[in-house]
Curated annotation (Swiss-Prot):
It is an enzyme of class 6 (ligase). The gene is guaAB. Pfam families: GMP_synt_C, NAD_synthase. Residues 1-187 form the GMPS ATP-PPase domain. Keywords: ATP-binding, GMP biosynthesis, Ligase, Nucleotide-binding, Purine biosynthesis. This is GMP synthase [glutamine-hydrolyzing] subunit B. It comes from Thermoplasma acidophilum (strain ATCC 25905 / DSM 1728 / JCM 9062 / NBRC 15155 / AMRC-C165). The lineage of its organism: Archaea, Methanobacteriati, Thermoplasmatota, Thermoplasmata, Thermoplasmatales. Pathway: Purine metabolism; GMP biosynthesis; GMP from XMP (L-Gln route): step 1/1. It comes from the Archaea.
């Protein structure tokens, strides 16, 4: 099938399955952005696009998503639920528990928005790798996906997943066909929660946001879009090590930098960047964020590792 045929297939499914009002959670990533545009074309004012600020997002994320909504003349709401999410995650260290809590909180917020909008349907941008990792069709569960394993069994909304059988390369091809950005990196639904190993605190979130911005800025400044890794980000580890600031001993956090090349997210190989780029990233992080004094580079492929650390 051609890319345009895939687009027609998705729009037909939305038209057939959604008979009333619907909402969609838009993260600003490739999958939900594509689905929100297609659903908007089909449903018009019967669709409400919701962006939930969980407090686990990157610097500038809210402004970027608002701009996207307005550029495409969408019916939207931005909900600041950051206090609720951070309170629910207090003291939680297990990655699966984090994902389940975030999934439940997310659905609670969406149910509230759906009730206010009188929506009966929830559109989700779940794609094939999401449910495969979550144990779909007799596969062992690798980890619960926020669009799959984190959802409560009893939902008030009827779930519609038009992208369920598509892979990331197909999503990008459809986005290209529609004139949407195709350089958007995948960003996990649980956000920075799965890039902080261990308990999530406001201090750790601040450190990781700043480190993430440095990693993204350095790579995007050094490399043309076609040269960039498929995904690149920072991970804050629950490990403190001894370092030196000036002539004084310092005890600071460790950050891992992850760069991965992939086509469909099912497999991936670690990127082999120049030493100069890695050195620039490490020096900038440790210079600008004194509480981080060590930077390591993840050289693990998928498999055996997953792309995200948690």
């Amino acid at each position: 099938m051609s890319t345009s045929s895939y687009i027609d297939q998705i729009k037909n499914e939305i038209s057939e399955k959604v008979k009333g009002r619907a909402i969609i959670a838009v993260s600003g990533g490739q999958d939900s952005s594509l689905l929100s545009v297609l659903a908007s074309q089909v449903l018009g004012d019967r669709l409400l696009c919701v962006f939930v600020d969980t407090g686990l997002i990157r610097i500038g994320e809210v402004d970027r998503v608002r701009k996207f909504f307005e550029e495409h003349a969408m019916n939207y709401r931005i909900v600041d639920a950051s206090k609720r999410f951070l309170e629910a995650l207090k003291g939680i260290t297990d990655p699966e528990e984090k994902r389940k809590i975030i999934g439940k909180m997310f659905i609670d917020v969406l149910n509230e928005e759906a009730e206010n909008f009188h929506a009966e349907y929830l559109l989700q941008g779940t794609i094939a790798p999401d449910w495969i990792e979550s144990g779909g069709q007799k596969r062992d569960t690798i980890k619960s996906h926020h669009n799959v394993g984190g959802l409560p069994k009893e939902m008030k909304l009827k779930l519609v997943e038009p992208l369920r059988d598509f892979y990331k390369d197909e999503i990008r091809a459809m986005s290209r066909e529609l004139g949407l950005r195709t350089d958007l990196q995948p960003f996990p639904g649980p956000g920075l929660a799965v890039r902080i190993v261990g308990e999530i605190t406001p201090e750790k979130l601040d450190l990781l946001r700043r480190a993430t911005r440095i990693v993204e800025d350095k790579i995007e400044s050094a490399l043309k879009p076609e040269e960039r890794p498929w995904q690149y980000f920072a991970v804050l580890l629950p490990v403190k090590t001894t370092g030196v600031h000036g002539d004084r001993r310092a005890y600071g956090y460790t950050v891992a930098v992850r760069m991965i090349d992939s086509i469909d997210a099912m497999t991936g190989t670690f990127t082999k960047p120049s030493w100069d780029l890695l050195e620039d990233i490490a020096n900038t992080i440790t210079d600008e964020i004194p509480d981080i004094n060590r930077v390591v580079y993840d050289i693990t492929n998928k498999p055996p590792a997953t792309i995200e650390w948690e």
